[in-house]
Amino acid sequence: MALRPGAGSGGGGAAGAGAGSAGGGGFMFPVAGGIRPPQAGLMPMQQQGFPMVSVMQPNMQGIMGMNYSSQMSQGPIAMQAGIPMGPMPAAGMPYLGQAPFLGMRPPGPQYTPDMQKQFAEEQQKRFEQQQKLLEEERKRRQFEEQKQKLRLLSSVKPKTGEKSRDDALEAIKGNLDGFSRDAKMHPTPASHPKKPGPSLEEKFLVSCDISTSGQEQIKLNTSEVGHKALGPGSSKKYPSLMASNGVAVDGCVSGTTTAEAENTSDQNLSIEESGVGVFPSQDPAQPRMPPWIYNESLVPDAYKKILETTMTPTGIDTAKLYPILMSSGLPRETLGQIWALANRTTPGKLTKEELYTVLAMIAVTQRGVPAMSPDALNQFPAAPIPTLSGFSMTLPTPVSQPTVIPSGPAGSMPLSLGQPVMGINLVGPVGGAAAQASSGFIPTYPANQVVKPEEDDFQDFQDASKSGSLDDSFSDFQELPASSKTSNSQHGNSAPSLLMPLPGTKALPSMDKYAVFKGIAADKSSENTVPPGDPGDKYSAFRELEQTAENKPLGESFAEFRSAGTDDGFTDFKTADSVSPLEPPTKDKTFPPSFPSGTIQQKQQTQVKNPLNLADLDMFSSVNCSSEKPLSFSAVFSTSKSVSTPQSTGSAATMTALAATKTSSLADDFGEFSLFGEYSGLAPVGEQDDFADFMAFSNSSISSEQKPDDKYDALKEEASPVPLTSNVGSTVKGGQNSTAASTKYDVFRQLSLEGSGLGVEDLKDNTPSGKSDDDFADFHSSKFSSINSDKSLGEKAVAFRHTKEDSASVKSLDLPSIGGSSVGKEDSEDALSVQFDMKLADVGGDLKHVMSDSSLDLPTVSGQHPPAADIEDLKYAAFGSYSSNFAVSTLTSYDWSDRDDATQGRKLSPFVLSAGSGSPSATSILQKKETSFGSSENITMTSLSKVTTFVSEDALPETTFPALASFKDTIPQTSEQKEYENRDYKDFTKQDLPTAERSQEATCPSPASSGASQETPNECSDDFGEFQSEKPKISKFDFLVATSQSKMKSSEEMIKSELATFDLSVQGSHKRSLSLGDKEISRSSPSPALEQPFRDRSNTLNEKPALPVIRDKYKDLTGEVEENERYAYEWQRCLGSALNVIKKANDTLNGISSSSVCTEVIQSAQGMEYLLGVVEVYRVTKRVELGIKATAVCSEKLQQLLKDIDKVWNNLIGFMSLATLTPDENSLDFSSCMLRPGIKNAQELACGVCLLNVDSRSRKEEKPAEEHPKKAFNSETDSFKLAYGGHQYHASCANFWINCVEPKPPGLVLPDLL
């Protein structure tokens, strides 16, 4: 996104499209056109539910954060990418209008129809009011923004290529962290109320306005949005959004994203949001917080009670709060995400308002509506009461959820025409969740007001340039499809029209989507050259980085399109499918009939998706796509159309097959996908199924799976900031679509590359791919979905990465990986990760707890852990991939995919192939899931593999299956390549690859064999490895990574260490199991992350404490053992681990060839955070050294270790002096802490690790004379002591031990001989 300063003006592909549309000019425009957001939005809506779709289109866009691209496409795309330009405001507006719905929509399920109706009405009123305000605001702002955008565009336009990218990179590099963090930090808290609309707009604006900053912002925004969307989208959104995959995200995003967007927007554009109280967003808490958070009289007693319980003179005691929060039953990663979203003041400690926010978000999340951003809480008139088993007081207040639903219902009424069906369908299929989704969903779509406003907004937007532009652009681009699309689009714009046409259109869109994919794929290939220029900003770099530059754009575009398109279209479709078996048939019927037109729509959808993607990552891609897409669409469209029409004709067959496949074939394929389907709801339509999967995921078991997909969508959306948006959905879809979509991609690519005939063959091959997909179907079922999701994630990650990388925020790029680790991108990534976690949490307890350790510990890890359940695996896969792999594997997947795609829709091909080879992958993923840690990466890898496979497939369209086999083998490299590419985009990736590969190989040296699946596992491990690898690989980024990680760790670790320390006694085992996987993996690649050790440490702290184990161990420890030997043994291990940590830090810093880079790394927040962690480790060694002396335990090995540690430490001090981090000698002098024989309770006071007095701190405080020694324990973590297994520990000792030595503290006893 950031990459596309010119295009997105800070948006990204989507932004670019919007911008292009508005001011981005032709360049952007293609994206807009390609994106065809309005239509795309329409598409997705259509897909979601025919009736719903039509209405949804306008509103859906608003409704779906993801779909964000749909109407947002016009607006959203603009919003995300270029929308800020002309359309952006409109989009923003529509978005805004929908934002409320979005936010509200998810809760639907929990309320009765009457309640929903009431809510809907209330929401409608509110919405109408807001709409009026927003309308004025929007118009006013639109002018300003457009002016600005045009200005920016005119100034940035020339730079769209490398320059823009460089600028964006510079800006992002400079501001990404701050921005991301800022956006994340502030927007989240502050993006609550009415802000959504304007904020989004603002966001769009920012996107547009701030060419560099904006891009950054967009990036952040998207990221934020993605994150937010992710959480809410997944839980909240998805159920509702079920109907609209895109919508799911958008719902999430709309509410969350919108809020998030607003946040970011607010932050960045707070100025711009004149009437919307943008600034508050920067004021993280208050402005956007609902009154019941800061108004004491409105705060529920339950909240107050918890506050009283946890409040201490020094503030809220995290240790006391932890068990209460854990009693919510939410996965730790989810709680970690909520925490990360709410904790804006003091890392590790919550303020009263933040506590209320956390409780409210937990309550919302428990209702199945991921509270991915505090802003979402504004939808609740009253504070939602969380259900905390540890707290009798808290009773859930259904009303709060209704608040969300109202928006849905509000829309619902307007949408009643088509929406009711959808809503009903949704409800039916979704079941409870469906109901929620449907009501929320329908409402959202229904938000006719929204629709109308959106329509109006949209029209304005269109008038503004986006909608018209997009539409026209699309038309122009699509040429054929253009007219149909335009009409569709317009229909989409006009809810009523769309409503009617929606069904047909929907099918069309589905087809269209693929058409788009195909077209894009084909055109992309053909237009590759152009895209590089366009997407060139981002892609160009990537493309250039990757030889497949064009392919990549294609790939990315495709992936994203597929993601977006597929996602959007299919999600919608699926939603329809998922939503109701009826719909799918309708869709099916519609699909074939509308295929021709559907193709167009599909394109639109794709474009929408693209926009989404664009908005996400593919903003570039989108732009890419858009320029390519238009051609693609046109060319492919024609092909597609012709192909499409004769569903079974070779090319047409392929297209239609794809489309139809999606519908029928895919329905079959996707029936399997349906399998995938665990999200069986998806079965009805293949691609729809994909979406259905998404939807189903979202809603049901499918909900679960769908959620993952949806989550992905949300994730996408969330990650969208990254490449989250379409990618995720796309991935799932891609996976399912993969055959169709990827085939489409391949086919289209091939079509465009090789022509219709080839396209047909390709399609056929791809269709086999589709069959393969079927093969994958099973694979897909569990794995493909995950892979797809993964891919989406991967794409997203890639996109994210691209964005980051392109943003010149390599660190960002890496950080994303780290971010996955929840480090560098603490805010964005962490939030992302958290959101992912949240989503995962939404997805399922399995994922949650799978992820929980990791999540908290390592969002990335959590991402990796996620693959605990099959569906969850998918979810997680995408999710996990997203978070951890998101940066790495996912990125890899995506990136590679993109790359491949760029090289001919390879991405899809690989995807498909992967899917084909995916069976093992699926298994792998599942297995990996079990690996908890590995699984995430596995999934990611799978995604990668898949992508790779697809790539191969693309390469060998005709020998698709063979390709699968051979590509499987290649996959490892592809995966690796991908990873590399993601990493470095080839060069970087190559370096990375080794790390990834190394991890991979280490984990699964036979990635080639199972290519996707094994690689995935490896990669999963690799993910960590990758993370770690990444870390090492980042030499230059090492710091960033490290800092990122450490940073994450610092706040995360602090929380973790607090939580973990608490965890030690409380949640150790739960955390541990997951964390252990993480840790194992982390540990397996310990050197890769010095930071990681810390991070890992926190992880481990959380994860490792296995209470039972510890107790057993304690039994052994406390038992009469050869004390001296045991002390020597335990300390030897401790010092050995500490030496590794310190050495890793030293080697990492020594490995940075450039002193300026090294200094920058060390002085960065993350670098300092990391080094402080190393200092803590060193301080632990100093304490242990005293313990060794005190107990007179002598051993050559210990002496040698201490010497080595001091030697490395002295070397490391030189680096620390660069950041004034060199610890005061006194802080390393713990002699005052030594327990002497005469001391009473000496054994009770002795730390189980170092045998020093755990209370020495307070004692020092009593003795001012020992001011300096007091410093030894004056860090925040020093103030913690933990009691575990009958022993007390210094928090830092226990933390280090658990994270770096083993999960169970040693429980050493002070010898009596003293």
Curated annotation (Swiss-Prot):
Biased composition (Basic and acidic residues): 976-990
PTM-bearing positions, type Phosphoserine: 473, 580, 720, 752, 772, 812, 852, 855, 909, 919, 935, 1006, 1073, 1075, 1087, 1098
Chief location of this protein within or outside the cell: cytoplasm
Database matches in Gene3D superfamilies: EF-hand
Regions annotated as coiled coil: 115-155
Any one Gene Ontology cellular component term annotated for this protein: perinuclear region of cytoplasm
Region (Disordered): 178-199, 460-498, 972-1026, 1073-1102
UniProt keyword annotation of ATP-binding present: no
GO biological process, alphabetically ordered: endocytosis; intracellular protein transport
Interaction with AP1G1, AP1G2 and GGA1: annotated segments: 666-678
Pfam family, any one: EH
Motif (DFXDF motif 3) on chain: 775-779
Modified positions (Phosphothreonine) in chain numbering: T1100
Ranges annotated as biased composition (Polar residues): 462-496, 1001-1019
Sequence motif DFXDF motif 1, residues: 457-461
Cysteine pairs bridged by disulfides in the record: none
Complex formation: Self-associates. Interacts with GGA1 (via GAE domain). Interacts with GGA2 and GGA3. Interacts with AP1G1 (via GAE domain), a subunit of adapter protein complex AP-1. Interacts with AP1G2 (via GAE domain) a subunit of adapter protein complex AP-1. Component of the aftiphilin/p200/gamma-synergin complex, at least composed of AFTPH/aftiphilin, HEATR5B/p200a and SYNRG/gamma-synergin, which plays a role in the AP1G1/AP-1-mediated trafficking of transferrin from early to recycling endosomes. Within the complex interacts with AFTPH/aftiphilin and HEATR5B/p200a; the interactions are direct.
Role summary: Plays a role in endocytosis and/or membrane trafficking at the trans-Golgi network (TGN). May act by linking the adapter protein complex AP-1 to other proteins. Component of clathrin-coated vesicles. Component of the aftiphilin/p200/gamma-synergin complex, which plays roles in AP1G1/AP-1-mediated protein trafficking including the trafficking of transferrin from early to recycling endosomes, and the membrane trafficking of furin and the lysosomal enzyme cathepsin D between the trans-Golgi network (TGN) and endosomes.
Protein name as catalogued: Synergin gamma
Organism for this UniProt entry: Homo sapiens (Human)
Gene responsible for this protein: SYNRG
